[in-house]
Amino acid sequence: WMGITLAAMLGHIGTASGGFGFGYSSVNSTGDSFNRMPWQSLPQGKNKIRDFIPVARVTDMLENPGGEFDYDGKKLTYPDIKLIYWAGGNPFHHHQDLNRLVKAWQKPNTIIVNEIWWNSQARHADIIFPANTALERNDLMLNPRDPTLIANKKAMESFHNSKTDYEIFSGLAKELGFLEAFTENKDELDWIKFIWDSSSKAHQRKDVSFPKFEDFWEKGFFELPKPETEKVMLNDFRKDPNKFPLNTPSGKIEISSATIANFE
């Protein structure tokens, strides 16, 4: 916060090589002149349940069903969780008090996980769907900050009884009676082509042309052309703060925040 405040006082925000920057050791965009690219994703529908908790509150949630907690200045309520389905990530990896978590983890009636490894999460689950690794499936490797899209071709067949996440969820959809609605009669390669085609259309608005999917898949990667002008963070805001407001209550750089000050 004070770094942004100092940069604002110096008046360099929105200028080339000026302003401020964070996450230099955790993101791959340092010195990157590319704008954020509109890579597309799979259609996901809308979850009708809007309630949520921060992931760091998992243990608290299991310990205190119906209890209240503070989040972003609001009072939210913990649900009474009877079943957990965890796919992607591992709560036993990023929670500090593991003894507390292990005890709270016993409260739900059923724990289901998609897991690659026989780790703590798998050992504390009731049902385990053995998921395979990125080496055992076809996929795309991309990042909105990265100008290169890579064809991630599987290097080996699935080990033993492991399955891709798509195969696991398709199997569940079949058992629940909505296989066709979930898969739309597409296999994994069809969905990869869908992402490619929809990304190609999105990039046309930026005057970027994609090759044919078959040519990309054979070559193994596609690199976007470098823009003629480099992007300067907050340059539009500097030129016209009314037309390009920031995502703050005031639309400006806030050295102090009445909203945060009112948090209990």
Tell me the role of every PLM-derived stretch.
Residues F129-P130:
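Catalytic alpha/beta core of large soluble enzyme barrels
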Residues I4-R123, T133-L140, W217-E264:
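Extended redox/cofactor-interaction regions of prokaryotic respiratory oxidoreductases
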Residues L135, P147-S158:
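Short beta-alpha connecting loops at secondary-structure transitions
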Residues P43-K48, A155-E254:
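N-terminal leader/propeptide and maturation segments of large enzyme subunits in energy/redox metabolism
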Residues D126:
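Catalytic, metal-anchored helix/loop core of enzyme active sites in primary metabolism
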Residues M2-M9, S170-E175:
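Short, hydrophobic/amphipathic alpha-helical patches that form generic packing surfaces
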